[in-house]
From Swiss-Prot:
<dbReference type="Pfam" id="PF13653">
    <property type="entry name" value="GDPD_2"/>
</dbReference>
<feature type="disulfide bond">
    <location>
        <begin position="45"/>
        <end position="51"/>
    </location>
</feature>
<feature type="disulfide bond">
    <location>
        <begin position="47"/>
        <end position="190"/>
    </location>
</feature>
<feature type="active site" description="Nucleophile">
    <location>
        <position position="41"/>
    </location>
</feature>
<keyword id="KW-0479">Metal-binding</keyword>
<dbReference type="GO" id="GO:0090729">
    <property type="term" value="F:toxin activity"/>
</dbReference>
<feature type="binding site">
    <location>
        <position position="27"/>
    </location>
    <ligand>
        <name>Mg(2+)</name>
    </ligand>
</feature>
<keyword id="KW-0354">Hemolysis</keyword>
<keyword id="KW-1015">Disulfide bond</keyword>
<keyword id="KW-0443">Lipid metabolism</keyword>
<dbReference type="GO" id="GO:0046872">
    <property type="term" value="F:metal ion binding"/>
</dbReference>
<protein>
    <recommendedName>
        <fullName>Dermonecrotic toxin LspaSicTox-alphaIA1i</fullName>
        <ecNumber>4.6.1.-</ecNumber>
    </recommendedName>
</protein>
<keyword id="KW-0460">Magnesium</keyword>
<dbReference type="GO" id="GO:0016042">
    <property type="term" value="P:lipid catabolic process"/>
</dbReference>
<keyword id="KW-0800">Toxin</keyword>
<dbReference type="GO" id="GO:0005576">
    <property type="term" value="C:extracellular region"/>
</dbReference>
<comment type="similarity">
    <text>Belongs to the arthropod phospholipase D family. Class II subfamily.</text>
</comment>
Length: 273
């Protein structure tokens, strides 16, 4: 999965997919009542990027729905996975469940079109704080209460705080989650980060008894770091330059081992070599 980083304006969806992304990451900010408000990152952000592009959250969802609904004039067949980077740092811990409920209602209405031929992409809820695990239950309970438990098949999870793998496993236990888990690891492109924890996550994924199904590394903009991440066995790479990742995947060393995921590849299934 080539994951376009910080795609917060509707126009950027096309831009990143055209460069080779089959997945995008979008920032979601919340107001003081735990309502998802904007797709917005703000300053500071990755080096070499405009941090200030934004949409109202529901407008972005509608644009995303167009891009992922077969038959729509804006449809992009390649775009199969969306990571919502939930900026819950502005919320109190006791608002996490509420944030999940409100997020689910917004997605149900504006992205999934109340279950009536909505967008088809798989969705990952990426949460920065382990204490905010109740967001997951708020979200999943709401889908069930609204009569759309089938949409849970399209839903995955990530804790993005680079916490110890054991602590993340614990948070999922508390949240009642088993399966559909992506584990992120990374840092802004302005800084360097080794692959120690990525290798630990990959080992958990491949052990057959860990909690992780997929591992992604962020934010990778250079060919050398792309090769290192692929050598470590990641499933996804988040990048500001999808064309760089595409180029490396076409190199002889990687062409036979990796391919770009399509809609038929289940993002919740651990790949068996």
């Amino acid at each position: 999965w080539i994951m376009g980083h910080m795609v917060n304006a509707i126009g950027q969806i096309d831009e990143f997919v055209n460069l080779g992304a089959n997945s995008i990451e979008t920032d979601v900010s919340f107001d003081s009542n735990a309502n998802p408000e904007y797709t917005y990152h703000g300053i500071p952000c990755d080096c070499g990027r405009n941090c200030k592009k934004w949409e109202n959250f529901n407008d972005f969802l509608k644009g995303l729905r167009s891009a992922t609904t077969p038959g729509d004039s804006k449809y992009k067949e390649k775009l199969v996975l969306v990571v919502f980077d939930l900026k819950t740092g502005s919320l109190y811990d006791n608002q996490a469940n509420d944030a999940g409920k409100k997020l689910a209602k917004n997605l149900l209405q504006h992205y999934w079109n109340n279950g009536n031929n909505g967008g088809r992409a798989y969705i990952v809820l990426s949460i920065p704080d382990l204490n905010h695990y109740p967001l997951i239950k708020g979200f999943t309970d709401t889908l069930k209460q609204e009569g759309h438990p089938e949409l849970l098949d399209k839903l995955g999870y990530d804790f993005s705080g680079n916490d110890a793998i054991g602590d993340v496993a614990n948070a999922y236990k508390k949240a009642g989650v088993s399966g559909h888990v992506w584990q992120s690891d990374g840092i802004t492109n302005c800084l360097l980060r080794g692959l120690t924890r990525v290798r630990e996550a990959v080992a958990n994924r491949d052990s057959g008894k860990g909690y992780i199904n997929k591992v992604y590394y962020w934010t990778v903009d250079k060919r050398a770091s792309t090769r290192d991440a692929l050598d470590a066995g990641v499933d996804g790479i988040m990048t500001n330059y999808p064309d760089v990742i595409t180029d490396v995947l076409n190199e002889a060393a990687y062409k036979s081992k990796f391919r770009v995921a399509t809609y038929d590849d289940n993002p919740w299934e651990t790949f068996k070599k």
